[in-house]
Amino acid sequence: MAKLENDMIRWGRLLFERRLISGWGGNLSCRTGKNNFLITGQHAPLAFLTPRDLVRLNSDGKPVRKQQSASSETPMHMAVYSGTDAQAIVHVHPPMVLAFSLTHESFVPVSFEEKYTIGEVPIIAQDTPTVTKPEKVVEALRYHPVAIIKGHGTVAIGKTFQEAFLLTDLLEEAVHCQFFKAGIATSREPASQPAKQERVAADGKRYQLFSKEHMTALVESANGDQDFRKFGDDTSLTTALTLHLEESNTAWTVKFVSGEITELNQQSDGDFLISGQAEWWNAVFSNKIYAFLATQQGKLKLKRGELAELSRWYKPFQRAFALWQTIPIQ
């Protein structure tokens, strides 16, 4: 417990030094066991934490020592632990992100690092000083490692405080760069982000995930797209990619030659094999999470091949998944 307390004290100070928090704002928490937690106390300044400012919680989110008062955001922290696999939570008020949230609906990543690490970050509406309806925060954090609360701050999760800290810091710097590029007064959603439009199946129905009809539609959409074929040709996209659905043990292998899909079969012998549960494949095909980000986070698992090798075809694959996300699924 002493090590966890020291870690929390250290990360609180670093958050303050990086100006990701000021005054008495923000709160930190972590799991200390299967059903036990440690959280900063009410009005505890993160820059100057001591062991007395840290509160042990039981499985109900109640202080083990009744004379202590936990952070007012404790219900949100408990909801996040219940709904995600978070081991540590960092909730702070980064000034750049806070200002950005007032004029945007989401953060759209620009750099490759942002796309790999945080993806598109939703901005959640809120009209109370504390998070009284954590459901939307939990939903966002199931698909993204960090979420933005409008006019309030960020919530980042990770296996450690370091991971949650780095996600928060990266997001603040990314927003800073967007402000620097566009100017705070004129910053708006990137004009190059078109509204998502779904293709409608001929019979008006949605495709069953990983059905033959669904996979055929994916192939046709890619081969019929001039940009995908150009990007694939430019990067010499020649490989075989297997997509695997865990629940039904369904596998499809898509073979690419010079940027064109030349074969689709139900084998599992691709150079690369990506496997995942239906929840995460649905999230990818519904544009809730980027495929590369889902793989980076372990929601989808690269069971064959190396991500670094796969990433050399990032541009055509990104285009393919953007097309595939327009195809309606059940």
Where are these regions (language model features)?
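Glycine-rich flexible loops
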Residues: 1-213, 271-273, 286-289, 297-301, ...
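Feature captures hydrophobic
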Residues: 193-330
